[in-house]
Amino acid sequence: MNDMANYLTTKIRLLVAMLAFILPFSFAKAEVKEDGKTISQGWYVGIEGGMPFGFSTFSSFGHDKTHLGWAAGLYGGYRFNSIFSAELSAKYGEMNLSAQDCCVERNYWLGSDGVLYKAGVLGMDSWEYANLKSHVRMGQYGARVNINLLGLFHQTANSRWDLAVSPHIYAVTTKADIRTIADDAKVMKGSTNWHLGYGADLQVGYQLTSCLKLGIYSGLTRLTGEHMDGMPEYQHKNNFLWESGIRLGINLPFTNHHP
């Protein structure tokens, strides 16, 4: 999994570098139309919902099964032209993560003091990793820049479709409670941790009407600071989210969009 994290981090860095190259062209193609406005300027708001997967000491792809998470939120932004838009968003979600195969095979235990042990501890409550899951609640608050790649080409600049790469930066809160898999009993209560989250999404959207836009997205967010799952950090250095979902946007009535 560490190799996967390094690979994904490298890809994110390459994507950000590519966007830094493309960004000046987005302003260059912002051709001024009627009354100084571009053909696709304006404010918009929307809702989004997705399925996040967490990768930390524990993982959504655990030894027992794949745990499906959920997340939902609101966003609002401004579209400057057919290429470039920026938005703010707020989202809440929950996930369950469980031990990976390697930790189960090594028979790791979690003590009630929050320390990893390689066997049960006499005189202290302890639990096998194989019997535990981490229930993570999270909030994400931040900003995103969208670069519509189709807008770079004259033939597709005014298409109903868009294909966007979207670097983002978030303030992320996580709170992880450790529970048993068998009966969902809470064995350790977590505290709230703050993280800086950064990454990028790939989005595909379609303008249904002059007001409504439907889209899908998939992206990665790497988290700084403490592990999101509340487990002791050992061997696994991963701490990132992979989320895919749908978006429904509404162009506000005082904006200027082409028919």
Feature roles, as predicted:
Residues K29-G77, T174-A176:
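Short glycine/proline- and aromatic-enriched beta-strand/turn motifs that initiate or cap beta-hairpins
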Residues E31-V32, F80-I181, L252:
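Gram-negative (and chloroplast) outer-membrane scaffold detector with strong preference
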Residues Y44, S85, D162-A164, G199, ...:
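Membrane-spanning beta-strand positions in outer-membrane beta-barrel proteins
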Residues T57-G62, W127-S134, A182-G190, M228-H236:
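Extracellular loop and loop/strand-boundary signature of outer-membrane beta-barrel proteins
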Residues A86-E87, M95-V121, Y129, Q207-P259:
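Predominantly the C-terminal beta-signal and adjacent terminal strand-loop region
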